[in-house]
Design a protein with these regions (language model features):
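Domain-level detector of nuclease and nuclease-like folds
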Residues: 103-227
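Secretory targeting and sorting signals
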Residues: 1-29
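N-terminal module-boundary/linker segments of secreted carbohydrate-active enzymes
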Residues: 16-19, 27-72, 204-206, 213, ...
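Secreted/periplasmic proteins that engage bacterial cell-wall peptidoglycan
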Residues: 51-126
Length: 227
């Protein structure tokens, strides 16, 4: 009888081992990044300051445009952004060719009715991103950055002219010609820097502070960090 009880308790103890061990085998998944909302002045204060270095930069270090967020729609990132930002939707033909449609380029306030007249601008230009920390990223992370549709402000459809004028300059050297666009632009610039953990140089930071402490003091910045 004692031997039978011993066997029974032994079997029960073995059966309990996986039950007791199971929580450890299913560790909780890391929490998703939380969206941050703050004033422009506070957001500017979160941007780290370092010297910029463009050594080794080429645009080919940032693969774009890739096949976009929806791999089944036949559209690349450029066309997906155009579709998302159209105020009048274009017709999508075979091969994701876009015809018709209307867009408003907020940099200069221009209405555009031809997709071919638009550039998709990286809010923080690729060269500026390289200077500000992306030079240390993997090629895969740089590709994600160059095609980032996870935040509405990362990529923006604007007139080719305004995009060429901007080139790879930061707000110390270029701002949208439309005064109504400038606070939005500064907010989206800072949002992108914080989203990707990019730094600023001294001149850039001082320019951002001028807007944050002056005409754009009521601007709100929203961003979700990329991990």
């Amino acid at each position: 009888m004692i031997k039978n009880l011993a066997r029974t308790f032994g079997a029960l103890s073995l059966a309990l081992v996986p039950l007791l061990s199971s929580p450890a085998a299913h560790a909780a998944a890391p929490a998703a990044p939380v969206a941050e909302v703050t004033t422009l002045a506070d957001a500017v204060g979160l941007v780290k300051v370092t010297e910029e270095d463009r050594t080794g930069y080429t645009r080919t270090k940032f693969k774009h445009w890739n096949s976009g967020d929806d791999k089944s729609d036949g559209c690349n990132t450029r066309n997906e952004v155009l579709l998302a930002e159209a105020v009048v939707a274009p017709t999508v033909e075979a091969g994701c060719k876009l015809t018709g449609g209307t867009w408003v380029s907020y940099y200069d306030g221009q209405e555009v009715t031809s997709a071919g007249s638009l550039d998709i601008d990286h809010m923080v230009p690729l060269a500026e991103a390289w200077d500000s920390g992306a030079s240390a990223w993997s090629a895969a992370r740089r590709e994600v950055y160059a095609n980032d549709q996870g935040a509405d402000v990362s990529l923006v459809a604007v007139t080719a002219r305004s995009n060429r004028q901007k080139s790879d300059q930061d707000p110390a050297d270029w701002m949208p010609p439309s005064p109504e666009a400038q606070c939005r632009y500064v907010g989206e610039w800072v949002s992108t820097k914080l989203r990707w953990g990019l730094t600023a140089d001294d001149r850039e930071l001082e320019a951002l502070k001028v807007y944050a402490e002056g005409p754009c003091e009521d601007t709100i910045v929203r961003y979700t960090p990329v991990v």
